[in-house]
Amino acid sequence: MDWQTLLTRERLGKPVHSNDELGRSAFHKDHDRIIFSGAFRRLGRKTQVHPVSSNDHIHTRLTHSLEVACVGRSLGMRVGEILRDELPEWCDPSDLGVIVQSACLAHDIGNPPFGHSGEDAIRNWFQQAAGRGWLDEMSDAERSDFLHFEGNAQGFRVLTQLEYHQFDGGTRLTYATLGTYLKYPWTSRHAESLGYKKHKFGCYQSELPLLEQITQKLGMPQLDDEQWARHPLVYLMEAADDICYGLIDLEDGLEMELLEYSEVEALLLGLVGDDLPDTYRQLGPRDSRRRKLAILRGKAIEHLTNAAARAFVDQQQALLAGRLGGDLVEHMHGPAKLCVQRAKAIAREKIFQDKRKTLHEIGAYTTLEILLNAFCGAALEQYGGHTPSFKSRRILDLLGRNAPDPQWPLYRAFLQVIDFIAGMTDSYATEMAREMTGRSSPV
């Protein structure tokens, strides 16, 4: 791979890239299109790790995505400055920052309500549906898309098909930004066989022609049938997510009183050492722990960002060859790598086991089971031109102009249902499930 091709400004759905406006490049337009999309806006009412809370300090998918985008921009700009002489003459180092920032903004845009619990619930429902014979009309590859449902593949569909120009390029982002978004540039046929990325994939069968087009435009080498090497900038987006995930989980753990401030402080001090800002040294006992943590977190992110940028530059040849094993965190050195790994371990041991989170996950399964039974059941009932019951007709009416056609293949009809359900916020999904079961909230 080479940077000239990897950083193309050409857009999906348009034969040539549009002219840059004064102070606004093609990549800035990508950023703006994502920010103003309905799918991005709805992240504000979707679970990050913990249930959407009355405590406004707890992260949602939206605040998490914004923070990841900030770190991703810094990573892209630092790498761009270091590699300035290797970039195309029309490309400014800051362009790398905007590309990575945009991909970071969109990295969770396909996640269903209730976060990873929602993904698990959808996969579990389709496994049961397969046992009932509901998926028998599909090919093995199509059936696999549902059995391995993945927010990353749904996000790719949102960006390339559903938002703005429906089924005509979607958001029509540049190929460079789409390539940087594609964390897993392969289909579900590889979801069981790729080591540390096991169970992950980034593209449904319905979007495979678009994936082929994008990888061809970017010069991403094909490794196997329906599998391509990753765009190098994906590793910066992934590192930004890892950095924020690790630190954000600890902050939320403190807010929910699942962790002691002293253990979080010790972890971050182990990373930054004596490199503390004067504002931190001047803090006294009357200063809040939130203020202390904010200052310490900022310095920690600086250290982790520097370490990730160094790892990227050190591994540039392997990245361009499409053969880097693992993620950038694995290629960091010293305290930075240990900090991220230890932060994730603390989250697994002390945060993810919280009773409130467990109850939320159980509720997610119940809610999504109700919705999938209703909408997929109605789509199945009318499949092949059969006349659905009155109830099923009313259920399909809720989809409006996006309701599946009775003559469509069942794969396409179920995808249309998933588009609707995966796009819901936690609160909307919960309320609709309540109303469908006759248990709507009292007026």
Swiss-Prot record:
Molecular function terms, GO-annotated: dGTPase activity
Q: What are its GO biological-process terms?
A: dGTP catabolic process
Q: Where is the HD domain?
A: 61-246
Q: Which InterPro entries match?
A: dGTP_triP_hydro_central_sf, dGTP_triphosphohydrolase_C, dGTPase, dGTPase-like, dNTPase_3, HD/PDEase_dom, HD_domain
Q: Which Pfam families match?
A: HD (PF01966)
Query: Entry's SUPFAM superfamilies?
Result: HD-domain/PDEase-like
Q: Which domain of life is it from?
A: Bacteria
Give the record's keywords alphabetically. Answer: Hydrolase
| Key word Signal present | no
Task: Give TM regions.
Answer: none
The keyword Nucleotide-binding belongs to this UniProt entry's keyword annotation: no
Supply the HAMAP family for this chain.
Answer: dGTPase_type3
Q: Can you tell me which family this protein belongs to?
A: Belongs to the dGTPase family. Type 3 subfamily.
Q: What is this protein called?
A: Deoxyguanosinetriphosphate triphosphohydrolase-like protein
